């Protein structure tokens, strides 16, 4: 597993790089984990509906090829893209999603934030509020896209959408529990737990 820390990046630029990486990889290619933040952007998944974008203001909307519906990415949110040959690892997509949820819950538990999952609604929640989203694409047995964990960000752009297609879905973030939390530190813990699941 090769890990890249990419800093803050434009969504479309990284999306194109993920597609290019996946298109040229073969059975000998190493899996990769890309860690980054995005400049403000709304992304529509393949199941996304235009009516779930309520008031985008000046924030760009990108129609993506990942699973799921609409979400928001912005600075202070940890994004981890999982470029993995799940066929080689003999992993189903549902198993991968479940493992990613486990990893996120472990990270949050480390900070004593009580997190849970919901049946039929991928992602991770604290009570009724969503703290992390998951959306993947599989092509030729290989995944791209991944997870987004709200660490210490401006959550107000989520009010301009129905997050993940759920009207009035409230969002939360780690800084509500730990005001001085740093994204870089959270990223390190995420990698640690990720590598316990995926060598």
Swiss-Prot record:
Subcellular localization: Cytoplasm
Transmembrane segments: none
Reactions mediated catalytically: octanoyl-[ACP] + L-lysyl-[protein] = N(6)-octanoyl-L-lysyl-[protein] + holo-[ACP] + H(+)
GO cellular component, one term: cytoplasm
Active site (UniProt): 164 (acyl-thioester intermediate)
Pathway: Protein modification; protein lipoylation via endogenous pathway; protein N(6)-(lipoyl)lysine from octanoyl-[acyl-carrier-protein]: step 1/2
GO biological-process terms attached to the record: protein modification process
Alphabetical list of Gene3D superfamilies matching this protein: Bira Bifunctional Protein, Domain 2
Keywords on record: Acyltransferase, Cytoplasm, Transferase
Binding-site residues, substrate: 66-73, 133-135, 146-148
InterPro entries associated with the record: aa-tRNA-synth_II/BPL/LPL, BPL_LPL_catalytic, Octanoyltransferase, Octanoyltransferase_CS
EC annotation from Swiss-Prot or TrEMBL: 2.3.1.181
GO molecular function list: lipoyl(octanoyl) transferase activity
Presence of the UniProt keyword Cytoplasm in the record: yes
Ranges of residues in domain BPL/LPL catalytic: 27-199
Role according to the record: Catalyzes the transfer of endogenously produced octanoic acid from octanoyl-acyl-carrier-protein onto the lipoyl domains of lipoate-dependent enzymes. Lipoyl-ACP can also act as a substrate although octanoyl-ACP is likely to be the physiological substrate.
NCBIfam families: lipB, PRK14342.1
Name of the protein: Octanoyltransferase
Lineage: Bacteria, Pseudomonadati, Pseudomonadota, Gammaproteobacteria, Legionellales
